[in-house]
Swiss-Prot record:
This is Probable L-tyrosine/L-aspartate decarboxylase. The modification N6-(pyridoxal phosphate)lysine is found at residue 208. One of its GO terms (molecular function) is pyridoxal phosphate binding. It comes from Methanothermobacter thermautotrophicus (strain ATCC 29096 / DSM 1053 / JCM 10044 / NBRC 100330 / Delta H). Its cofactor is pyridoxal 5'-phosphate. It is an enzyme of class 4 (lyase). Signal peptide: none annotated. It catalyses: L-tyrosine + H(+) = tyramine + CO2; L-aspartate + H(+) = beta-alanine + CO2. Its EC number is 4.1.1.11, 4.1.1.25. SUPFAM superfamilies: PLP-dependent transferases. GO terms for biological process: carboxylic acid metabolic process; coenzyme A biosynthetic process; methanofuran biosynthetic process.
Amino acid sequence: MTYTSGRILGSMCTSSHPLARRVYCDFLESNLGDPGLFRGTRELESGVIGMLGELLSEPDAAGHIITGGTEANLMAMRAARNMAGAEKPEIIVPKSAHFSFRKAADILGLRLREAELDQDYRVDVESVRKLISENTVAVVGVAGTTELGRIDPVEELSEICLDEDIHLHIDAAFGGFIIPFLRETGAELPEFDFKLQGVSSITVDPHKMGLAPIPSGCILFRDASYLDAMSIETPYLTEKQQSTIVGTRTGASAAATWAIMKHMGREGYRKLALRVMGVTRRLRDGLVELDYQLVVEPELNIVAFNHPAMGPHELADRLEELGWAVSVSSCPPAIRVVLMPHIMEEHIELLLRDLEGIRLREE
C-alpha cells in the first residue's frame, strides 16, 4: 500500500513532494553531526529554523532539524529538566499527549503526571494547575492532538507557566504546519506559538503537513540558552559542542526541508491547508448524511466517528477487508481518519460509498 493510493487514512505522514525527494537524494552523503565537513547543510538547517521561527512568531528561535516529534519532545523535556535542576523532576502532560512523553520520562528519569481533559477533549487547565508542585519542570500542551486534532488552551497554559516560572512545551508536531496557515486564511483557531510569552519550546514536523521526506522533524526553543543547557563537548569533531540527542544526523533532511519550504512558500501552504480542510468537510458532511456519529466537530484535518451499532474495531476490520487502512483512537474509541494531502475528494467518495454499504448490510 502507498500513500498515493489514497487508501492510507490513519497516518499523519504523507507523500513527500517530488522536489523534496530529489534534493534529499542529492544530499545523502552529508552529516549534520559534523557540520564543519558539510558547511552548506548547516546553513540550510539554520535557514529552516529561521523560516519556522518567523512562522511561529519568534524570528530569533534556536533549534535543530531532527528525526521527528519523538526526538523533539525528548529534547524539550531534557532542556526543561536541565534548566530547572529539580531533585525529583516531574512533567505534566494532557491525557491526550503523544506516547513519546512516556518514553522521555523513562529515559530522563522524570515522573509523568497526566492532566484530565475537558468535555471537548482538550486539556483541563484547572487539572494542570492542581498538579503543579515544586518538582514540576515542564508543562506540555498540544496543538493538534494525535487522535482528534484538538488544540489545547495554550494561552491559559502560558499564563500559568509564566506565573509559576515553568517551562511550557507545545507539541505541534501535527498542527505546526497547518494551524498558522489556516489562521492566515481567516480561520478562528487559538494562538499556540511563541507570541505567547510563556511558551518555551515547540515541536513541529515538516514531514507531516510540510511535505518533507521522512525523517524531517524540528525542535524550536525561544532562544539558544535551552540548547546550551543540553550541550556537551565533542572534542574530535569539527564542532566542539553538541546539544542534539543523535550524533550522526543526515543533512538530507535539512536540504530537502529548506527546498520544499522555499518552493511552497506561505501561499502554497495556505492553499494546501484549505484543500485538506475542504476534503475534511466533505467527509464530515458525508458521515452525517449516512448517520454515522461524529466524536467532535473537526478542528483540523482529522475526523473521528463511530457506527451507531458497531464497535470501532469491528468497523476498522470491515474497512480493512475493503482495502482501507484506518486507525482506531483510544480516547475515546472511534475510527480516526487523518485527511493528509495524499487523500483527494474522489478517495473520500469511495470511502463513503463503502461506509454506506456497511450501514445497509447492518439494517
